Amino acid sequence: FTVTWTRSADGIIRELSLAAPAGATDAARAGVEITANAISDATVAFPTEEIGVGARWTVTRQVDDAVAPTRVTTYELVDLDGDVATVRSRTEAPDPQDTLTAPAPDGGPGVTLDVESYDVSGSGELTVDLRAAMPVGGTTESSTRTAYVDPDSGRRSTYEEDSELSFRTVD
């Protein structure tokens, strides 16, 4: 597998592409895609103005999420040693939609569900070498908890996902 991304000077990944070997299974492709997107989400977006230790800034970005397409991340610079920065982050998904509309897999009529609850949160502390392609140390954690209700049947569905992404330098 080859994962390629273009990161702008502020740290935001602007383009992400994946290339899989010809014999790769769909499951392997999906796993690499999930990991690549997680790494992309874990990058630190720095402000364009100069900052110092103790600085806090907030970044709002759009994501591929039909219920809560906006993510708001607040960062804090906790240490800076030359080109190496340690940054804490906290992420949330404000203002989720009241309904989720999804196409049917067979191309038939779509499905609309009421969103009973939708909570997305994340936090972490990363060590970022400003000369490196990705963080060189640290961990981020994220959690998603959702509950949907079919308005026709009253059937309730829940979804829970927890993930942790750790970075470390290997010598």
Model-identified regions with their sequence ranges:
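Low-complexity, intrinsically disordered segments exposed to solvent
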Residues: 1-83, 123-125
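Acidic, serine/threonine-rich low-complexity disordered tracts
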Residues: 59-171
